[in-house]
Amino acid sequence: MRSDNTKKGDARAPNRSLLKAIGVTDSEMKKPFIAVVNSWTEFIPGHIHLDKVAEAVKAGIRNAGGVPFEFHTIGVCDGIAMGHEGMKYSLPSREAIEDTIEIMIQGQQMDGMVMVTSCDKITPGHLMAAGRVDIPAIVVTGGPMLPGFVDDKYTDLVSVFEGVGSCQSGAVSSEKLKQLEDLCCCGAGSCAGMFTANTMACMTEALGLSLPGCATAHAVDAKKMRMAKESGERIVEMVSEGLTARKIVTDKSFENAIRVDLAVGGSTNTTLHLPAIAHEFGLELPLEKFNELSKTTPHLIGLRPGGENFMIDFERAGGVQAIMKRLVTKLNLDEKTITGKTVGENIDEFVIVNPKTNARVITTIEEPLHEEGGIAVLKGNLAPDGSVVKQSAVHEKMLRHTGPARVFDSEEEAMETILKGDIKSGDVVVIRYEGPKGGPGMREMLSPTSAIAGMGLIDSVALITDGRFSGGTRGPCIGHISPEAYEGGPIGLIQEGDIIEIDMPERRLELKVSEEDLEKRRVLFKPVEKEATGYLSRYRKIVSSASKGAIRE
């Protein structure tokens, strides 16, 4: 066992003495040492219950003859960080989480680990660490929040964000906004739609690193606690088997995950996180792979924000395994999973408990919601290295759009103009200097996109940015434009009133300005330098382009 490096032989008597000081017995010294990597925090609804989930994991480890050791990681709530300087720290926290896990796992020489996680950048950080340290690893995601219920219908946090714009335009009252605020988020769990947190939970299951059914088992469901305990039991077996993370996850596993992502209409943040995770597994996942697979992967379920179903509907319809069963002819079925069985064997064992709900919520490949997957990668003279859009959440009439640029050098500038009502039908809002280096930190633009939606402009106004979006964003919103403005990308050359052409079916994003005029602008170009101190200052120096997953170089 790896942990014998800390506890076996006469030379390790001092090490054992310290372990005995924390209560480890002689008999336990002979057992596998299992880390329980817990991102529990009191800041985040998606994490508030993870202390209890971790206790269930530890019980499972003990049941199977292992010794659990729990430690914690940091976690930023994107929803609470939204719309202000705090959001600059969200994406950079991904690498900080990964680093701290590596330090603890390698420093203490753990035999295996169960990672208890939830929410947007935290789960990717855990997955990246799993690839880097390459020991037996299982991920237990915390599960979705139940939806709220307002005006006789289910709702979620995005309704509150969009309510801000609706209130500003006079469409709803301050009293109604307060009602939404009070009732849309009703307890523990990650936000109730197919936003980034739940998308990444689905990716984890599709990659084979969670037990089947884990992604959609809700935070308040006893099923989650049972799965946590089963994960604790299974990790001890995996240590005995020598089944490490890199023996499970391959290029083909990532293809499976991307197909699930495309079929469920997942968050565009997967185009950052999956390449970054692949990098830590020693693999390369080019952005173009999303386009390649999108052409042959239909969109099968209308989940918020790209539909009216919530995660509870998806869970009752069978969750990720139900989607994989629909996609069975397109998946790599021989890939291993943490169950010890293959993807195909797991699908064969999956039973549809609610056939009517399954048929209502999840379409067939023959009659999908959309022939193509949820995400498209656009390129052109405005995004030579690529940009991304959740096309499944765009109204058909806005798949192609041409309009004048309204240019802003920060989210705050754009938000002020939007809320004043100065954005008109047909406009293309440009928010730049929000990229990985330019922000720095690549903030999410959920506040401006939700304001546009709340003001009734979602089907007539586009927004493009070198920043990124929440998984809750809907509409013609194109992000991750690369190269970013800070690095001299064409988005930095746009002037007020320039015509921008968006063509999602053809995967094009064009600035309708002659190359001669653009060259004149390049000569005069000087990037905006936003102040950055501490961690963000270091991050700016080492982060790569969004087209490469914003990994560190």
Curated annotation (Swiss-Prot):
Mg(2+) binds at D78, D120, K121, E444. The active site is at S470 (proton acceptor). The modification N6-carboxylysine is found at K121. Binds 1 [2Fe-2S] cluster per subunit. This cluster acts as a Lewis acid cofactor. It comes from the Archaea. It is an enzyme of class 4 (lyase). It catalyses: (2R)-2,3-dihydroxy-3-methylbutanoate = 3-methyl-2-oxobutanoate + H2O; (2R,3R)-2,3-dihydroxy-3-methylpentanoate = (S)-3-methyl-2-oxopentanoate + H2O. Its EC number is 4.2.1.9. GO terms for cellular component: cytosol. Pfam families: ILV_EDD_C, ILVD_EDD_N. Belongs to the IlvD/Edd family. This is Dihydroxy-acid dehydratase.
